Amino acid sequence: MKSKLKPTNDWLVTDDNPKMREVCTEVKFPLSQEVLDIIDKMLAYVDESFDDNAEKYDIRPGIGIAANQLGLNQRFFYVHFTDFCQKEHRYLLINPEWIDKSLNKAYLAVGEGCLSVPKDKDGYVIRSETVKLKGFDYLTQKDVEISAHGLLAMCLQHEMDHLEGKFYYDSINMMKPYFKKDEWVSIDQKVCDQCK
């Protein structure tokens, strides 16, 4: 499933738009043309990033995008990336819901970025180390349950935050951006042995 659209940064809604702080509403089935059009844009933008074509289209590369980042405040998002263990992940989740989030914490060692945040914010984004969620995967046309750790867990939480009107930098300690506890897991290439 591939889009024929040519992605552009003009599609993106940025964090200075108050609509990005609104909680997104549930998607109704059957899917409207408006939802299908946003899905097409999601596939175009993230898949061209995945295929290393961001420079070709002069777009900021991204591994995930939520519907509200493209102007529709409804509950769906798309992720497509290869993790540190070279495993490909690709989901377009509609009406996702958390089943479980671990009390153990983790963070991406390199920090996080966002297509809707033009100027990156430095610091560790503290999240749950492991998560489990469910939703309808548009790509497989099935209800799915996903258990995740590592980069996938961080990415899913990042996109779910968007659906709640939150940004990654809301979870950075503004007084001590790089504060961490010894028991928190640093997600980087060293965690690859956990993926096997």
From Swiss-Prot:
The active site is at E159. One of its GO terms (biological process) is co-translational protein modification. It comes from the Bacteria. Gene3D superfamilies: Peptide deformylase (3.90.45.10). CDD domains: Pep_deformylase (cd00487). The keyword Hydrolase applies. One of its GO terms (molecular function) is metal ion binding. Its EC number is 3.5.1.88. Its cofactor is Fe(2+). The keyword Glycosyltransferase does not apply. Fe cation binds at C114, H158, H162. It catalyses: N-terminal N-formyl-L-methionyl-[peptide] + H2O = N-terminal L-methionyl-[peptide] + formate. Keywords: Hydrolase, Iron, Metal-binding, Protein biosynthesis. Belongs to the polypeptide deformylase family. PANTHER family: PEPTIDE DEFORMYLASE. Removes the formyl group from the N-terminal Met of newly synthesized proteins. Requires at least a dipeptide for an efficient rate of reaction. N-terminal L-methionine is a prerequisite for activity but the enzyme has broad specificity at other positions. This is Peptide deformylase. It comes from Mycoplasmoides gallisepticum (strain R(low / passage 15 / clone 2)). The gene is def.
